Amino acid sequence: DSQWKEQFRKHLEYWTTGYGGKQIAHTPDGLAWLFQWGSMRHATTTAFLAYVAADELFADDAAAATKYTDFADSTMNYAFGDNDLDMSYVIGMGDKYLQAWHHRTSSGAWNDKWSNIGQTEGEDAKPHAHTLYGALVGGPDQTGKYSDKIGDYQYTEVAIDYNAGYTAALCAMVQKYGGSSDPDFPPTETPKWTEFFMRASINQAAGSYTEIKAFAMNHSAWPARVI
């Protein structure tokens, strides 16, 4: 319907070159930035809409299609590492990506001490149990700053809605540019620490007996399975 198509166009104009004298804000290195929580979510979801607009709704308007495609490509490339930090906001992608994503399951923490996971120092510093390959995190603030700490979850959180539009944009890229699967992906994971161990001590002892206190410790960070 022409009315909804026009609303679609107005939305994308606001996110690209501006509409009605207004335009989306940008980080210094060029990311279209709506607000702090999930800045990459908003940008990559709009990138998906831009791909749809370029390939379907406005395919007969060469100038608009080019503008929307360029916006979508640059936004996705920003997420992949084409930014002033030279860092990918997609976990496990590229030579440099964030290390402290806010995702409890992949952290493998068996207690509530997980604030230093992904850090190189601190009482609880250790790597995540699992690399959450392909997940998009929240993203930078308006200055382009990013804090790679689990506790700063406005930057590091992984959420379903953060990844929905991003995944759709990836599908649009594959449809548009093609691609192939990596036969060596994902790599085989090995436990990063001892998963199962015993702790025992003498609880009490007398001339005729010795009472042992023993604990079987399960620090596995894997899904339920037969051991």
Please annotate each region the language model reported.
Residues 1-21, 33-188:
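Aromatic (Trp/Tyr) and acidic
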Residues 206-225:
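Short beta-strand elements of extracellular/lumenal beta-sandwich folds
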